[in-house]
From Swiss-Prot:
Involved in regulation of actin and microtubule organization. Part of a WAVE complex that activates the Arp2/3 complex. As component of the WAVE1 complex, required for BDNF-NTRK2 endocytic trafficking and signaling from early endosomes. The lineage of its organism: Eukaryota, Metazoa, Chordata, Craniata, Vertebrata. It comes from the Eukaryota. Keywords: Acetylation, Coiled coil, Cytoplasm, Cytoskeleton. PANTHER family: PROTEIN BRICK1 (PTHR33668:SF1). InterPro entries: BRICK1. It is found in: Cytoplasm, Cytoskeleton. Homotrimer when in free form. Directly interacts with WASF2. Component of the WAVE1 complex composed of ABI2, CYFIP1 or CYFIP2, BRK1, NCKAP1 and WASF1/WAVE1. Within the complex, a heterodimer containing NCKAP1 and CYFIP1 interacts with a heterotrimer formed by WAVE1, ABI2 and BRK1. Residues 41-72 form a coiled coil. The gene is Brk1. GO terms for molecular function: identical protein binding; protein-containing complex binding; small GTPase binding. This is Protein BRICK1.
Length: 75
């Protein structure tokens, strides 16, 4: 009986080692996913801010171009 328990014990230990490995991999994937989601939100926010600034600049340029075309002086 003692000889049969040894392989069983080995399988149990191997199973636990596999489960721990899977847990580590799963945890790492979750951390990467959380980071990527956070990075995505940060990039979207920054791009939205840049878009607003560019839109404001485009409007100012159009206004200045219109005044120059009409021959008005810029004051």
């Amino acid at each position: 009986m003692a000889g049969q328990e040894d392989p069983v014990q080995r399988e149990i230990h191997q199973d636990w080692a596999n489960r721990e490995y899977i847990e580590i991999i799963t945890s790492s994937i979750k951390k990467i996913s959380d980071f990527l989601n956070s990075f995505d939100m940060s990039c979207r926010s920054r791009l939205a801010t840049l878009n607003e600034k560019l839109t404001a600049l485009e409007r100012r340029i159009e206004y200045i171009e219109a005044r120059v075309t009409k021959g008005e002086t810029l004051t």
